[in-house]
Every structure is written in structure tokens, then in C-alpha cells.
Amino acid sequence: MKKGDIFFMEKKKMKLWKKIAFTVLAAVIIIPTVGVIVNASIINEIIVSQRKTINEQNFSYTVQANSAENITTKIYYKDGTKMYVIQNNDRNMIMWKSQSTDEMINVVPTALKATISKCDEDKTANIPYLIDEQTSKTMKLSSIITSEKVNGEDCYKVNNLGLILWYSKSTGMIVKAMNGTMTTDGKETACVTEFKDWKFNELTDTDMTRPNLTGYKVTNNA
């Protein structure tokens, strides 16, 4: 092979390697950028739905975790009044909170006991897993987002650094959360919490009335 041919071949190889390097560099830059853009669009969509739902100020839902305690909590919220109905096998407890009276009442129906105390809770609806500004930035940059059905509902599955969240596409509300693991009877399983039966604008003032403590032994710490 002539010296000129060798030079030509080497030059051709250099051009090829430059093209390959440019393609790889472009892929390294473009693919993550596209991912961030897609993530941003989805997260913004969830946030818009959440804000619309929060503005309703009238909702209820049920929380159930796969824990050994077998606790189910029903949460009701309307115009500054919040009520929890906590069920643990045969034991029930009701917690009622009012922003207007700054009052919190804990009721144990089976024991006919109640405690009244001052409510210093934050004046918000406290919906779980709402996406704030800082969380939004993290999710957009570091999440893997796919679509998945949970209990028949279309959801966005957001895997953010090991914390996996499923958000309803229609309401933006959290439907399911998976975070860490637990060991039960020597078996390691994922810690899963489900947020079910979301309902909006169905609660009435009667539903959220202060508990009737007639016949209860009441401890007043207000």
C-alpha cells in the first residue's frame, strides 16, 4: 500500500471516529434532556390537577398500609374541619379538628372516653404527597415516569430515587406509595400504602359536625 493511501485511510478513520464521538456526545446530552422535558410536562400536569382539587376544600379518602397493625384510616375534610376515623381490627378511634374553633377532640367510642384539646395544626388540608416547588424540581430531574393502572385507575408511576409514587391522571391525587422494606416473620416485603376511595364535593356540614359527647367521660385539656 502506498504511503498516500495509508494517509488517506488514517484520515478517513479519524473522520469516522469524530462522527462516532459526536453521535455519542449528542446522545449523552439529548436523551437526558428529552427525559427531563417529558418529566417536566408530566409533573406540571399532576401539579395543575392537584391545585384544582385542593381548591375544592371538600374531599375524603381512605389510607391503608400493608403493616402488621392492620390499620385503616378514613380522612374527611371540608372547609377547615378535618376528621379521622381510625380502625384497628375491633378498636376504633375518631379524631375531629376544627380551624374555626381551634379545637381537637379524640373519641374512643368503645370505651366512651373523649379528650378535648387545643388544635394547633397547620391551617391547610394536609393532602399527602402534594408536589411542592422543591419536590417538583427533584422529580423532574431524577425520576423515571411511566404509566400504570392501580385498582383500575390510570396513574403516573413516578420512581424518584427509590420512592415510588402513583398519581391519578384525572385528579393528581396520590393513589399508592412504596417506600423501603419491612421484615415480617422473617420475610422482607415492600412497604406499601394505598390511598383509596377519593371523593370530592360530597361532604355536607352535617357529616363534619362536632362529635356528640353525651354519655362520654370527657377530659378537657383545652
What are these regions (language model features)?
Residues K3-T81, T204-A222:
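N-terminal leader/targeting segments and the immediate start of mature chains
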Residues N58, I144-I145, C155:
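A generic structural signal for ordered secondary structure
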Residues A65, Y84-I94, I105, E148-T214:
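Gly/Pro-enriched, hydrophobic low-complexity segments
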Residues N70-Y129, V175-K176, G180-C191:
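An acidic-aromatic
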Residues A114-I116, C155, Y216:
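Tryptophan-centered short beta-strand motifs
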Residues I131-K149:
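Short acidic, Pro/Gly- and aromatic-enriched capping/linker segments at domain boundaries
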